[in-house]
UniProtKB/Swiss-Prot annotation:
Membrane topology per record: Single-pass type I membrane protein
UniProt cross-references to InterPro entries, sorted A to Z: Kish-B (IPR042863), Ksh1 (IPR009653)
Name of protein: Protein kish-B
Extracellular side: 23-52
Species assigned in the record: Homo sapiens
Length: 74
């Protein structure tokens, strides 16, 4: 279990958020519903989706490293 109030918990949450938003960008219905706004509070979802799609290799490597850390080291 990961504590959200620690640094590694925030990193896990951020990676999962970016990966989820990048997945939402690939689903047409979710893209129009959730990622239509580019500013404001709802714009955070759009920005995370853009980060997830443009840096997909780095995000994937970070997810694998974080999974290894959470499962075996922590």
């Amino acid at each position: 279990m990961t504590n959200v109030y620690s640094l590694d918990g925030i990193l896990v949450f951020g990676l999962l958020f970016v990966c989820t938003c990048a997945y939402f960008k690939k689903v047409p219905r979710l893209k129009t519903w959730l990622l239509s706004e580019k500013k404001g509070v709802w714009g955070v979802f759009y920005k995370a989706a853009v980060i997830g799609t443009r840096l997909h290799a780095a995000v994937a490597i970070a997810c694998v490293v974080m999974a290894f850390y959470v499962l075996f080291i922590k």
